[in-house]
């Protein structure tokens, strides 16, 4: 790939598609799990949506930890699904089995249509309350506001290819912001690269130049939802640009809005909502409510008061649900 990373392609969906064609009565296939259920990843959006809504789907057994199925023979970040389809079945819904550490939780799940189902059945009631809050307030989801990874067209090999166009950024040094910018990008291409701050001429940015003068709240593009590692959420100031190592959740003209959004995005409820969909950029934030107005005059939240308490109350969560959410976040890593 042009950015120095090796492209990866999913192929397992083709086995399911072929099995559908040749199986006379039923098929049972084992393949990576989390992303197809959430219609996330290359080639999986249409496949995942079609499969989860197929009336021939009889059961989905999901193991978040692939080692419970394969031992140390496979390290699959997506977990594993055992998917059973029956040719003659024409009834809505399917049996969903969530298997963790030797225990199973079985539930009947309706075909979700355009919605995504939570991977953990314990999350269904809470996510339904989040959806109700979004619907009742005519809000959108944050996914729609997230800016593309290629926002400033700075590839991860930019520093390697253009060593004369950058210099390391040292905190406190004088920078002429009329002609120069701070640039957050990888020092090397590929997995060995680490995101670091540099100083570069403003003219190295040729796309979306207007965003240099705004504040973005960004996360690591590799861990955007915070599932496996800290998402490194931070505010990038209005003199800066960044490469593909970061993705902007939102951009604001004022620091106040960026700071309010940052506080919102780091609450228990919103961090939990990020975990409800895969952190690949195709599905990031699909269940995160976006209140859109992050100024002090917004009608939903008072940013001068405790946001966690306000969100729990607005979403109408009971004490057990609040305790569950806090436990999910506090035991994440």
Feature-to-residue mapping (PLM):
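Broad hydrophobic/π-residue packing in well-ordered secondary structure
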Residues: 1, 11-15, 35, 71, ...
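Conserved Class I SAM-dependent methyltransferase catalytic core
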Residues: 1-68, 79-82, 261
């Amino acid at each position: 790939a042009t950015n120095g990373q090796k492209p990866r392609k999913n192929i397992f969906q083709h086995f399911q598609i072929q099995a559908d064609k040749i199986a006379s009565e039923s098929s049972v296939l084992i393949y990576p799990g989390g992303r197809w259920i959430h219609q996330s990843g290359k080639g999986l959006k249409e496949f995942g949506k079609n499969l989860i809504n197929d009336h021939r789907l009889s059961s989905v057994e999901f193991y978040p930890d692939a080692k419970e199925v394969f031992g140390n023979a496979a390290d699959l970040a997506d977990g594993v699904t055992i998917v059973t389809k029956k040719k003659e079945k024409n009834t809505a819904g399917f049996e969903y089995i969530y298997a963790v550490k030797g225990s199973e939780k079985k539930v009947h799940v309706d075909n979700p249509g355009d919605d995504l189902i939570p991977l953990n059945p314990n999350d269904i009631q809470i996510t339904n309350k989040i959806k109700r809050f979004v619907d009742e307030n005519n809000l959108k989801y944050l996914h729609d506001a997230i800016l593309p990874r290629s926002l400033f067209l700075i590839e991860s090999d930019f520093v390697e290819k253009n060593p004369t166009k950058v210099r390391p950024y040292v905190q406190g040094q004088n920078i002429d912001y009329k002609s120069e910018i701070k640039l957050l990008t990888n020092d090397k291409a590929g997995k060995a690269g680490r995101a670091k701050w540099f100083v570069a001429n403003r003219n190295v940015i040729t796309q979306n130049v207007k965003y240099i003068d705004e504040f973005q709240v960004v996360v690591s593009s590799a861990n955007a939802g915070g599932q496996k590692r800290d998402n490194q959420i931070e505010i990038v100031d209005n003199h800066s640009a960044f490469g593909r190592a970061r993705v902007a959740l939102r951009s604001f003209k004022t620091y106040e809005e960026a700071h309010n959004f940052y506080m919102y995005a780091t609450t228990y409820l919103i961090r939990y909502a990020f975990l409800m969909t895969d952190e690949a950029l195709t599905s990031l934030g699909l269940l995160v409510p976006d209140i859109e107005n992050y100024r002090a005059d917004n009608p939903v939240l008072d940013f001068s008061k405790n946001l966690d308490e306000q969100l729990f109350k607005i979403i109408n969560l009971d004490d057990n649900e609040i305790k569950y959410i806090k436990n999910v976040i506090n035991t994440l890593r």
